[in-house]
């Protein structure tokens, strides 16, 4: 085996025949792989022709490393060779490496080749061609080719295209990623959430955790139709997407709901809210991350199989529902989670770590909670897990349907801030009375009307 020092020394000798001999395809695969993998940066004038015979080597790793090293040279003389190789190669990773090598040349002669790549059947190959063509911003031929991807049948290609086109067109956000406006911190707003949204700036909150109101489960007059209900939630969660910081999370607790029958001549109807909302959420820009199942004890379930228990007739079985969905989404971003982590100082990351025992599966067994002031409340444990798993200390946690305010209370417990909206005055009053008498939360929050919330944001009272 050649040492790294020996390889580096030979690279600097333009008259050396070392690489022509050392990279002969007759050598053992392990020898070739070691040499190709340790070449590092190649000097100007390096003879890239030594790699060409290896493009037809039977070992796919050797072919891939050979084409990668050709790409380091950024030499147009290899354009035709690489184009032919990319068209004939069967391994996806190696084809992508060849297309990447073509793109690194930054030669306009490569545009027709890369344009042809966009018609490939492999989405990963198309994606690589897209990235390569983005280097030719402003070139009419390249722009025209890229525009064809707007309606590409593969959703990942469409998403990649949209991310690339909008990467430089995002609005400038005044506060940094880890910060939020002081006027939004620890505030309960008693108002219609859709009116409240008109006052909240873009990219203001770090995490949203909420459970929407049930569809007409208790009052038939709340929503005109199930579609109207879904449209309402869609509007709310689209605005939630707008005010969420880049790459941050939205967690939705929902479950199928039963609407009682309107007469003895009709049957009750069950609506699959989380499943009906899912495509709407992904369409508006939320990326699906996880489906967590909240499992409640059987005694907490409404009995739906009493009749079947008595007569055992087929077709009449109805299971007692002991689960609810906790759907986890992330605001789509071209940045990875690592980028989000780097927006915080080391101390914040360290102190926000989840050090206690935690549930490793997506099945969370948690007892339900009750509250005399609200008919449907989050268990503290459920909110605690979500807030710890998907936010840092000092983050702003949002709940557009605050109810009894569990999200806000637990946010404070974990040294986060909260922003809550609740339109029912009696629920807001319940929060104010309960928290105001607690030794844990005295004077740590504001209860504001919509008008006062606007004044709080603008500083004009």
Describe each PLM feature range.
Residues 28-30, 45, 60-61, 76, ...:
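Alpha-helix N-cap/helix-start positions at coil->helix boundaries
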Residues 97, 122-124, 128, 182, ...:
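Core catalytic lobe of class I
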Residues 147-174:
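Eukaryotic acidic, Ser/Thr-rich intrinsically disordered low-complexity regions
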């Amino acid at each position: 085996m050649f040492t790294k020092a020996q390889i580096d020394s030979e690279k600097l000798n333009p008259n050396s025949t070392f690489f022509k001999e050392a990279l002969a395809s007759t050598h053992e695969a392990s020898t070739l792989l070691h040499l190709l993998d340790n070449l590092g940066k190649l000097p100007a004038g390096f003879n890239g022709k030594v790699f060409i015979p290896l493009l037809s080597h039977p070992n796919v790793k050797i072919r891939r490393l050979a084409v990668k090293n050709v790409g380091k040279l950024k030499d147009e003389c290899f354009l035709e060779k690489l184009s032919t190789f990319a068209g004939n190669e069967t391994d996806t990773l190696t084809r992508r490496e060849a297309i990447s090598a073509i793109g690194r040349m930054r030669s306009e002669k490569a545009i027709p080749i890369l344009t042809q790549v966009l018609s490939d059947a492999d989405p990963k190959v198309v994606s690589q061609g897209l990235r390569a063509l983005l280097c030719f911003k402003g070139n009419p031929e390249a722009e025209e080719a890229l525009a064809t991807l707007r309606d590409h049948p593969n959703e990942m290609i469409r998403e990649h295209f949209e991310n690339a086109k909008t990467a430089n067109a995002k609005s400038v956000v005044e506060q940094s990623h880890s910060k939020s406006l002081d006027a939004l911190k620890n505030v309960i707003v008693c108002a219609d959430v859709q009116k409240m949204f008109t006052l909240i700036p873009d990219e203001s909150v770090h995490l949203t955790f909420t459970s929407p109101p049930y569809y007409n489960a208790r009052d038939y007059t709340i929503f005109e139709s199930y579609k109207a209900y879904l449209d309402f939630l869609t509007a709310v969660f689209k605005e939630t997407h707008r005010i969420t910081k880049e790459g941050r999370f939205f967690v939705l607790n929902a479950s199928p709901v039963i609407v009682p029958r309107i007469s003895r001549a009709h049957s009750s109807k069950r609506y699959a809210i989380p499943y009906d909302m899912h495509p709407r959420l992904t369409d508006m820009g939320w990326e699906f991350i996880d489906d967590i199942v909240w499992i409640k004890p059987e005694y907490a379930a409404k009995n739906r199989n009493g009749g079947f228990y008595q007569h055992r007739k087929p077709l009449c079985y109805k299971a007692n529902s002991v689960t609810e969905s906790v759907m986890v989404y992330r605001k789509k971003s071209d940045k990875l989670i690592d980028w989000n982590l780097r927006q915080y100082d080391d101390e914040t990351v360290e102190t926000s770590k989840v050090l206690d025992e935690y549930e490793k599966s997506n099945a969370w067994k948690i007892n339900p909670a009750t509250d005399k002031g609200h008919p449907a409340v989050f268990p503290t444990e459920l909110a605690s897990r979500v807030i710890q798993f998907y936010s840092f200390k000092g983050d702003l946690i949002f709940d557009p349907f605050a109810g009894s305010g569990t999200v806000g209370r637990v946010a404070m417990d974990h040294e986060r801030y909260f922003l809550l909206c609740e339109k029912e005055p009696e629920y807001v009053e319940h929060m104010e009375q309960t928290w105001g008498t607690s030794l844990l939360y005295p004077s740590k929050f504001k209860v504001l009307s919509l008008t006062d919330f606007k004044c709080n944001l603008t500083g004009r009272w």
